[in-house]
UniProtKB/Swiss-Prot annotation:
(Microbial infection) Interacts with tobamoviruses mouvement protein at the plasma membrane; this interaction triggers defense responses leading to programmed cell death. The gene is Tm-2nv. It is found in: Cell membrane. Inhibitor of viral mouvements which confers resistance to some tobamoviruses including tomato mosaic virus (ToMV) (e.g. isolate L and W3) and tobacco mosaic virus (TMV), but not to resistance-breaking isolates (e.g. Ltbl) ToMV and tomato brown rugose fruit virus (ToBRFV). Elicits a hypersensitive reaction in response to avirulent (Avr) movement proteins from resistance inducing tobamoviruses (e.g. ToMV and TMV) strains, thus leading to programmed cell death. One of its GO terms (biological process) is defense response to virus. This is ToMV resistant protein Tm-2 netted virescent. It comes from Solanum lycopersicum (Tomato). Pfam families: LRR_14, NB-ARC, Rx_N, WH_DRP. GO terms for molecular function: ADP binding; ATP binding; ATP hydrolysis activity. InterPro entries: AAA+_ATPase (IPR003593), Apaf_helical (IPR042197), Disease_R_plants (IPR044974), LRR_dom_sf (IPR032675), LRR_R13L4/SHOC2-like (IPR055414), NB-ARC (IPR002182), P-loop_NTPase (IPR027417), RX-like_CC (IPR038005).
Length: 861
């Protein structure tokens, strides 16, 4: 979509202009002027793109070509900027005056071409009267349909009986906080249907009632007028002083209102000035539905939230059956063939438990012959035409996103369906693509801003939370299949990305591919063998089992590639030859290799000046490159659990001495690094480091970490692996931000309360000797939620987790994980005061014969 490309161009031009100003000063003032002009013009064009799209959606086909021209212009400008930056960096590096002059002329000529195209676009815009406003007629039609549906007499709910009963009990509870029930969830789950049935069941128990559709662009005056009409306020009072008269009446009435589809909190701030508090003695109630959990949380508090989930398979098929046969119990599957029933179940499975998708699909099938052939054709087309009815509703949520968040949402479509996606990956890929840019004056890191975007997507119920980290952040997430299809369709329509299935075709279209993802080995290899021209490719995702994929990549330069992700899913360890051409990807910012692969990154990788993230999965035995790093932007260097592998497989002495060539101000993750190649004085330079892992920790490193004033003030995660018992006692009490600590020692290590950070949330002790003294220290940690003891030796056979006389023991601990204990035969907790928040006791590995007290037995199941 044009607005996405325009945003990318704006962000890149801001970055380039800033770099020119800092690095070049007055010598390249003319370049900065051109870059600034590009930025201004792209902002101006972006300001009226939404209006142009609204006119096209409203039936004005004349603007279609204009939008296409804008999209092509934005793409060409992005290409120019991506091609421009490496050239200027190269000319600066060698300081060739002639080369600089030649490049300047070339760039100036391209800018002149762009200026002429901008003039033409602006002329056409004025001709079609496209202005900077938002008037999406198609949305208005959809809103009207929703208003009709809101008052339609359809209260049948399938599979939501438990939700209904819980909500009814909550709503009638006299102690309901704020008097609000918030039904939240992704589009299509049946929030409105459930809320309507609930509302209609209880409204007779109140003196007045009303249901209103709030909409995406609400007006408080219209909503209040609607409420006034429904509760019987006289016409004269509505005309004279609506708000005061309405509030006066509601103060003495017990009311219930259903506010459907609330998109943001601003409208509530206006409405609550008129609506009396619901938690008063009168006992009024408000039911809201929203796609955004934060809206419900803001209006009614955390306790008001009730999150709907997709239907289970049998409930889904029950709803499908009701809709297919129009709720006629006399007309059912009795006369259908078993094959037709199976096809029906497969169709329902494709709907992913979303009631809206099931209803739309059933409605379409009712218009067809009830034959296996007809239904099979529908099944084969699932993911495209069948979901069109849902797409309009889902697209509302997409269009409501801030422009900067839209490409972040579309990125989920690059992954296979039902794939669990790490937040770390998403955040750093968004940054690599310049979807997230830190503006001047903003002290927050790009990672923090990207995390805000991810939290917002989850809050809007567009993305499903899978796991949280030790400190409550999002660790991984998923996207529902229905929304995944929306991402793929929108991306294909706008040329944002393409899947393998639609990558083939006109060579001209293939040459314009900017992002592509492969889920199949055969399709991937066939595509590369076709020798496509991929001159504009920015992102390449490969989910494969065939290790030969790397050899096929060797034939391409990928000169504009920003992001490369290779995920190998074969079960065996495979040696791969990573092409030396990887070092020619001058625009590469993000590289992730995952799976059972063994090989070496080419040394030319260190020459990539724009590299920001190298992330090697824990199963991948990939030898790092050697040489002096030239990138001043490297933020994350992650060899996850690489330490155990590298000691036996590779010599890395040629790599780590060059760690000093990294730009210390940007580095945030360094995992793992052998201590023998790591001078403790380097710690003082890593002022923004958040995650650090060191192998074979020496006494000098322990001493440096233990000084009174912390050397790593931003550190949040610390992993230390000792190859021998340290003589120095570690002291981490001066590190307030460390929330996750991993200590791997050789049996003995003197520890006390000063050894640990004060705000520790997750602690892992590996190969540790545990005695009653260290256990007494651990019991006092005020914020510890997860404790893992991995292959530890226990001096006493019995580990008593209860507190002393005051009962103070693990006040916040939620998970205790004991793996392959040595010398432990009994774990007890004999009181209910100790570990009041413990939810889970995990015994894994070799743990035969360990007895548990009754309370712990229940938590270990």
């Amino acid at each position: 979509m044009a607005e996405i490309l325009l945003t990318s161009v704006i962000n890149k031009s801001v970055e380039i202009a800033g770099n020119l100003l800092i690095q070049e000063g007055k010598r390249l003032y003319w370049l900065k002027e051109d870059i600034d002009w590009l930025q201004r013009e792209m902002r101006h064009i972006r300001s009226y793109v939404d209006n142009a799209k609204a006119k096209e959606a409203g039936g004005d086909s004349r603007v279609k070509n204009l939008l296409k021209d804008i999209q092509e212009l934005a793409g060409d400008v992005e290409d120019l900027l991506d091609d421009f930056l490496p050239k200027i960096q190269q000319s600066n590096k060698f300081n060739y005056c002639l080369k600089r002059s030649s490049f300047a002329d070339e760039f100036a000529m391209e800018i002149e071409k762009i200026k002429r195209r901008v003039v033409d676009i602006d002329r056409i815009r004025k001709t079609y009267n496209i202005i900077d406003t938002d008037n999406n007629n198609d949305d208005c039609v959809l809103l009207d349909r929703r208003r009709l549906f809101l008052h339609a007499d359809e209260t049948e709910i399938i599979g939501l009986d438990d939700d209904f009963n819980m909500l009814q009990a909550k709503l009638l509870n006299q102690d309901l906080h704020y008097g609000v029930v918030s039904i939240v969830g992704m589009p299509g789950l049946g929030k409105t249907t459930l809320a309507k049935k609930l509302y209609r069941l209880i409204r007779d128990q109140f003196e007045c009632s009303g249901l209103v559709y709030v909409s995406q662009q609400p007006r408080a005056s219209e909503i209040l007028l609607d409420i006034a009409k429904q509760i019987g306020l006289t016409e004269q009072k509505m005309k004279e002083n609506l708000e005061d008269n309405l509030r006066s009446l509601l103060k003495i009435k017990r009311y219930v209102f259903l506010l459907d589809d609330v998109w943001d909190v601003e409208i509530w701030d206006d409405l609550k000035l008129v609506l009396p508090e619901c938690d008063s003695k009168v006992g009024s109630r408000i039911i809201i539905t929203s796609r955004n959990s934060n809206v419900g949380r803001y209006i009614g508090g955390e306790s008001s939230l009730h999150a709907l989930q997709p239907l289970e398979s049998e409930k889904s098929f029950e709803l499908f059956t009701k809709k297919i046969f129009n709720f006629d119990d006399n007309n059912s599957w009795a006369n259908a063939s078993p094959d037709l029933v199976n096809i029906g179940r497969n169709i329902v499975g494709r709907c992913g438990g979303i009631p809206l998708a099931i209803v739309v699909t059933a409605g379409m099938l009712r218009a067809r012959e009830r034959t296996e052939h007809a239904w099979n054709r529908v099944l084969e087309s699932m993911g495209h035409k069948v979901q069109d009815g849902c797409a309009k509703v889902l697209a509302l949520s997409y269009n409501d996103l801030p422009i900067a968040s839209r490409p972040c949402f579309l990125y989920f479509g690059l992954y296979p369906e039902d794939h669990e996606i790490r937040a770390f990956d998403l955040i750093n890929m968004w940054i690599a693509e310049k979807f997230i840019v830190v503006n001047s004056g903003n002290r927050r890191e790009a990672e923090d801003l990207a995390e805000d975007v991810l939290n917002d997507l989850v809050s809007r119920n567009l993305i499903q939370l899978a796991k949280r980290t030790y400190n409550g952040r999002i660790s991984s997430c998923r996207i529902h299949d229905l929304l995944h299809s929306l991402c793929v369709d929108l991306a294909k329509e706008s040329n944002f990305f393409h899947t393998a299935h639609d990558a083939f075709g006109d060579p001209g279209n293939v040459a314009r591919l900017r992002r592509i993802t492969f889920y199949s080995d055969n399709v991937m290899i066939e595509f590369f063998r076709s020798n496509p021209k991929l001159e504009k490719l920015r992102v390449l995702f490969c989910f494969a089992k065939d290790p030969s994929i790397f050899s096929h990549m060797a034939y391409f330069d990928f000169k504009l590639l920003h992001t490369l992700v290779v995920v190998m899913s074969q079960s065996f360890q495979a040696y791969v030859t990573i092409p030396s051409k990887f070092g020619n990807m001058t625009c590469l910012r993000y590289l992730r290799l995952e799976g059972n692969i063994c090989g070496k990154l080419p040394n030319s990788i260190v020459k990539l000046t724009r590299l920001e993230t190298i992330d090697i999965d824990r199963r991948s035995l990939i030898q790092p490159p050697s040489g002096v790093w030239e990138s001043k932007h490297l933020r994350h260097l992650c060899y996850r659990d690489y330490g155990q592998a590298c000691n036996s497989c590779f010599s890395i002495s040629s790599f780590y001495p060059n760690i000093y060539s990294l730009h210390p101000n940007n580095l945030q993750t360094l995992m793992w690094i052998p201590d023998k190649f790591f001078e403790p004085r380097l710690l003082h330079r890593l002022i923004n480091l958040r995650k650090l892992g060191i192998l074979g920790v020496s006494n000098s490193t322990v001493k440096m970490l233990s000084i009174f004033s912390p050397v790593l003030k931003a550190l949040e995660v610390l992993k230390l692996s000792f190859s021998s018992d340290p003589s120095e006692q570690i002291k981490l009490s001066s590190y307030p931000h460390i929330a996750k600590l991993h200590l791997n020692v050789n049996r003995t290590m003197a520890l006390n309360s000063q050894s640990f950070p004060p705000n520790l949330i997750k602690l892992t002790l590996a190969n540790f000797t545990v005695d009653r003294y260290i256990l007494a220290v651990l019991k006092t940690f005020p914020k510890l939620r997860k404790l893992k003891m991995f292959i530890c030796k226990y001096n006493e056979e019995k580990m008593a987790l209860s507190g002393e006389a005051n009962g103070y023991s693990f006040p916040q601990l939620e998970v205790l994980h004991i793996h392959s204990p040595n010398g432990l035969s009994e774990v007890t907790c004999t009181d209910d005061v100790s570990m009041p928040k413990l939810k889970k006791l995990l015994l894994t590995g070799f743990h035969c014969g360990i007895s548990l007290s009754e309370r712990l037995k229940k938590l270990s199941k």
